[in-house]
Structure formats: C-alpha cells, structure tokens
Amino acid sequence: MNKRDYYEVLGLSQGASKDEIKKAYRRLAKKYHPDVSKEENAIEKFKEVQEAYEVLSDDQKRAQYDQFGHAGPNQGFGGGGDFGGGFGFEDIFSSFFGGGGGRRRDPNAPRQGADLQYQVTLEFEEAIFGKELNVEIPVEDPCDTCKGSGAKPGTSKETCKHCSGSGQVSVEQNTPFGRIVNRQACGHCSGTGQMIKEKCTTCHGSGKVRKRKKINVKIPAGIDNGQQIRVSGKGEAGVNGGPAGDLYVVVHVRNHEFFEREGDHIICEMPITFAQMALGAEVEVPTVHGKVKLKIPAGTQTGTEFRLKGKGAPNVRGYGQGDQYVVVRVVVPTKLTSHQKDLLREFAGQEEQDDSLFRKLKRAFKGE
C-alpha cells in the first residue's frame, strides 16, 4: 500500500512552519483519536497523522523526507505503533482540563535549586583592579532540625491516603468529546504521594529555613558596569537531593570625577593653558596606574587626543590591556593682570597684521 504524502496527511503545504504543523497535528489527532472518533478507520487515520507529525516535526527527518520522500535511505521513520510519539492523548486535551497532561514532572524527582541574584556597587578603581569581598545573601537552606524532611524529628512522612501514594487522582469531566477521565496532581499531598502528619516546629513542614549565608566573591580585574559574575552552586539548595542553584553577582560601578570608561579604554579631559598649547609643554597626567609625563607639541589645538598605551583597564577575560586617551582642553583665564592684558593686546595686534586663516576666511565670506 502506497503511503500518502505527509504534508497531504496534515493538510499542509511543503513550506509549512513548525507551528502550523503542530496545530494541524493537534486538530487531526483530536478528530481521529479512537477514544473519541466513531469513524470505522479512525485508528489507521490516527496512526497516519501521528507518523506524519513524527517526521515533519523533526528537522533532520523532515529534511530527509523533503529530499527523498518515502523511498529515502531510512524509509519507514518509525511512526504508527502505539499512541505514543509526539503528543499523548492527555497532552492534546490539556487545554480543556487546565494542563493535566500526561508528561507530568515527578514532584519527588531531584530538582536544581533556584538561582539567586546579588547587586554590588564598586568604586571606579575597584572595577579596574578587581576585588575580593564577602557578601551576605538570604537563602533557603534545608532545615537542620528535620534534615529537610519537614517532619517532626522521630516521625516520618506517611503515604497519602487520597492518592495511595501515586501523587495523582482521577477526575471525570464532561467535554465536547464526551466524558473523559483526567489524571491530575493530588491536592492533598501536592502530587508528592506523601503526607506529613506531625510537622517540624522549626520549618513548619516546609523542610527549609531562611538563613543569611556568607559567600566569598572574587571580582575579576577589568569588570565593567552592568556585567555579572556567576558563582556556581551558591544559589538556593536543591530539591529532593538535586544540585544547588547558582549565584549571579551583578556589578555596578560608580562614576569617577575625572575618568570615563569605554570598554577597556579610559578617557579623560586634561585642562592646559593657552601658552602651553601654543608653545608646547610637558604636563603630568593622572592615570589609574599613577601619574605619567605627556609632551604637548607646540601649536596643539584644543580637543586634540593623545594616547597613553597600556594605561587603560585590563580585559576582564584576560585579553590584553586597554589604553588611556587624553583630550586636551584650553582653559581661558577669567582674571588677568594689567600686564597680561597688555601682552594679549599686543599679540592680538600682531595677529591682525598676519595674513592668517581668519583673514582668509573673512575675505571668503565677503566674496573678495
């Protein structure tokens, strides 16, 4: 018997998206499921739909099918068989019953603890050079009194009488498809299958207590504002013997009055006098690594940028060192002596006699 095209089975084109494939499968699986459909060949159609979905929902199988069809090198993709595969019947109807699907997570299975986040504020230099600090964080740890069981010492948990220890109960519901028996978590034991008859007086049956835990955190040199550090296994304790979560330390860096940060580079503005810019000078520039000498060539213009190699921040991942960029700004004096004013007037007079750039610009604007 020749197999129908899988896209034809689901009523889709070959360019259908994953979401369209999933929706088509759900619709047809509801229609042909043997527990619902009264059609004579419902079982065969359901298996056909399930097989088509199993192939088209898998990227690798779908690509192979698109290239070779049913006669491909791995013809016969599985499919058919039981009503397992992609979605179970309980999954299909979960939207009607509030999510009581078949693939429930075992509440007694080991689970990783929750991750925690801690905010820390550093000074500018601390972020550049790194720091080691001890932080106190509130965590939920297993109760020492009951060893995390939640039961009073000397007692133990009992099997839930309502679900006989299975953690699930059967509930009958009327649906558009008829009366359906739905399995859902037992409300008496929260799906654990166990009940605590006598609760621990310290943790009141939760098995956990709130504590403040001291943790040593190493801040790497070169960390920047907004970056975070992961401290493995320092989050909330795991559940049912599962591993602990992680701690994420989010770093905030205070602004500096003189320096600014751009990645691994440090930027600063250096005020110098008109005379230093015109005549040239050697000035002392502060860096996070100490003061350094910087030569200002004669005739330097305000806004000129100088590079101090290797005077920036270290790369937080260890890939070298940034630089410091010094932008010079002329400082115009606000108070002058009579002698200084006379010197400037004399200088200004000499400038007017020169065929300077300013005169050329002036003539250009006048159209001369």
Swiss-Prot record:
Residues in CXXCXGXG motif repeats: 143-150, 160-167, 186-193, 200-207
One annotated Gene Ontology cellular component of this protein: cytoplasm
Taxonomy of the source species: Bacteria, Bacillati, Bacillota, Bacilli, Bacillales
Sequence positions that bind Zn(2+) 1: C143, C146, C200, C203
A GO BP annotation: chaperone cofactor-dependent protein refolding
Keywords in alphabetical order: Chaperone, Cytoplasm, DNA replication, Metal-binding, Repeat, Stress response, Zinc, Zinc-finger
Superkingdom of source: Bacteria
Family of the protein in this entry: Belongs to the DnaJ family.
InterPro entries: DnaJ, DnaJ_C, DnaJ_domain, DnaJ_domain_CS, HSP40/DnaJ_pept-bd, HSP_DnaJ_Cys-rich_dom, HSP_DnaJ_Cys-rich_dom_sf, J_dom_sf
Subunit record text: Homodimer.
Subcellular location: Cytoplasm
Matches recorded under SUPFAM superfamilies: Chaperone J-domain, DnaJ/Hsp40 cysteine-rich domain, HSP40/DnaJ peptide-binding domain
Zinc finger (CR-type): 130-212
First and last residue of the signal peptide: none
Residues bound to Zn(2+) 2: C160, C163, C186, C189
Keyword Zinc: yes
Pfam families for this protein: DnaJ (PF00226), DnaJ_C (PF01556), DnaJ_CXXCXGXG (PF00684)
Cofactor annotation comment: Binds 2 Zn(2+) ions per monomer.
Entry GO MF terms: ATP binding; heat shock protein binding; unfolded protein binding; zinc ion binding
This protein's domain notes: The J domain is necessary and sufficient to stimulate DnaK ATPase activity. Zinc center 1 plays an important role in the autonomous, DnaK-independent chaperone activity of DnaJ. Zinc center 2 is essential for interaction with DnaK and for DnaJ activity.
UniProt cofactor(s): Zn(2+)
Protein name: Chaperone protein DnaJ
Physiological role: Participates actively in the response to hyperosmotic and heat shock by preventing the aggregation of stress-denatured proteins and by disaggregating proteins, also in an autonomous, DnaK-independent fashion. Unfolded proteins bind initially to DnaJ; upon interaction with the DnaJ-bound protein, DnaK hydrolyzes its bound ATP, resulting in the formation of a stable complex. GrpE releases ADP from DnaK; ATP binding to DnaK triggers the release of the substrate protein, thus completing the reaction cycle.
Gene3D superfamilies, A to Z: DnaJ domain, Heat shock protein DnaJ, cysteine-rich domain, Urease metallochaperone UreE, N-terminal domain
Record-annotated J domain positions: 5-69
Organism, as annotated: Bacillus mycoides (strain KBAB4) (Bacillus weihenstephanensis)
